[in-house]
């Protein structure tokens, strides 16, 4: 985790509270882990095996409507990035990532975690109090960071790309549009008492979204600039939809809720 000073934390808290939803600075890393996909799965399994989640909560950690809204919003944002992306992959729902998100949300800890998973996964957090009309009220603040972000064009990367952010943070947005982060799983949890930067929030609505593969690698751009779908990985077989490298998913949303 990148630490932020008490002064900047207080300022950030003040700025974000004006929107009724608070987001937390997320981490960046200098290089991808050398471990393969099975290590990610092993880390997820270890977390779920050790998590103390009441059985009543295990039945459903996010509604079908909320899941669809989050997934569709991410793909909409990813397909409309500017400058356009040549290798932006279509994002699909991952049940294991969602279960992992619930295990962390159930702790009601306002911080990223667990730490051993963050080597493999990206994570965006959001919290608010009071009623809300749509789950996207907790998600859109991540995208709103785009107004403060300057994309690093190829000529800016010599060889490492600079991170040009002219606001409190931009890494929630960059994680949303990280081209290779093609899986997402989220959970929402109501915390009766949650400590948010020194203040106790009553009945805080806590959203955790996990992403894989992890994005926000230091020195790298979120995606490759170019004609949409012109640099898709070979595994996609040339399939493209709405400017996204499309995997030809055959299962529908209901599959995840059987």
Swiss-Prot record:
InterPro entries registered for this protein in UniProt: Allrgn_V5/Tpx1_CS, CAP_dom, CAP_sf, CRISP-related, PI15_CAP
Annotated function: Serine protease inhibitor which displays weak inhibitory activity against trypsin. May play a role in facial patterning during embryonic development.
Positions of the propeptide segment: 20-60
UniProt protein name: Peptidase inhibitor 15
Pfam families: CAP
Gene3D superfamilies assigned to the protein according to its UniProt record, in alphabetical order: CAP
Organism this protein belongs to: Homo sapiens (Human)
Tissue: Weakly expressed. Expressed at low level in prostate, mammary gland, salivary gland and thyroid gland.
């Amino acid at each position: 985790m990148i630490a932020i000073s008490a002064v900047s934390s207080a300022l950030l808290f003040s700025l974000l509270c004006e929107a009724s939803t608070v987001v937390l600075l997320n981490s960046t890393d200098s290089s991808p882990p050398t471990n393969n996909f099975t290590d990610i799965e092993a880390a997820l399994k270890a977390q779920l095996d050790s998590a103390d989640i009441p059985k009543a909560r295990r039945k459903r950690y996010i509604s079908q409507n909320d899941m669809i809204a989050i997934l569709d919003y991410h793909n909409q944002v990813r397909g409309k990035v500017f400058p356009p992306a040549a290798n932006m992959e279509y994002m699909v729902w991952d049940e294991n990532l969602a279960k992992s998100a619930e295990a962390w949300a159930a702790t009601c800890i306002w911080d990223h975690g667990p730490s051993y998973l963050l080597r493999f996964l990206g994570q965006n957090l959001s919290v608010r109090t009071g009623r809300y009309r749509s789950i996207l009220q907790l998600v859109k603040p991540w995208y709103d960071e785009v107004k403060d972000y300057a994309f690093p064009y190829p000529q800016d990367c010599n060889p490492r790309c600079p991170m040009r952010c002219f606001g409190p943070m931009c890494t929630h947005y960059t994680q949303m549009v990280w081209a290779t982060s093609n899986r997402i799983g989220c959970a929402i949890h109501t915390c009766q008492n949650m400590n948010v930067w020194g203040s106790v929030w009553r009945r805080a609505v806590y959203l955790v979204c996990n992403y894989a593969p992890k994005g926000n690698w230091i020195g790298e751009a979120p995606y490759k600039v170019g004609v949409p779908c012109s640099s898709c990985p070979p595994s996609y077989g040339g399939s493209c939809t709405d400017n996204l490298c499309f995997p030809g998913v055959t299962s529908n949303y209901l599959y995840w809720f059987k």
